[in-house]
Amino acid sequence: LTTICTNDFELYKNTNMGNSAGYSSSKAALNQLTVWFASALSPKIRVNSISPGGVYRNQPATFVKKYISKCLLGKMASEENIVGPVIFLASDLSSYITGQNLVIDGGYSKV
């Protein structure tokens, strides 16, 4: 799932990539479901989610150029950029974290 909510229609202009209201709605639902499960399953089970930003997978050049211009780190993520935070959330290092959505988007959602 990409970012917190993909609502920048300009990114998808002149590409064959979609930007559906259904995607944005499902991401919001997933974030709320994370909080619900964390509340329902605590204290024995921790529940967290991630919101990765755009992961580069040979998207159209126009999309990539627009995306990186709005990303504080100036690049799209690779799968490797997502792995570390996921391992952290699955480890005991995050034993006091639950009900959270970790945004891993290189600062895209802050612009």
Predicted regions and their residues:
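A short C-terminal helix-loop "cap" of Rossmann-like NAD(P)-dependent dehydrogenase/epimerase domains
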Residues: N58-L72, M76
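Catalytic loop of short-chain dehydrogenase/reductase
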Residues: L1-S42, G54-V55
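Short-chain dehydrogenase/reductase
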Residues: T34-V35, V83-V86, A90
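Conserved SDR Rossmann-fold cofactor-binding beta-strand/turn motif
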Residues: R46-Y56, A90, V103-D105
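A conserved structural motif in NAD(P)-dependent oxidoreductases
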Residues: C71-I82, L93
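Short, small/polar-rich loop/turn modules that mediate ligand/substrate recognition or access, typified
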Residues: S42-R46, I97-G99
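Conserved functional loop/turn residues at catalytic and ligand-binding sites
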Residues: F37, K75, D92-L93, K110
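Short C-terminal tail/terminal secondary-structure segment
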Residues: E10, N16, V86-I87, T98-V111
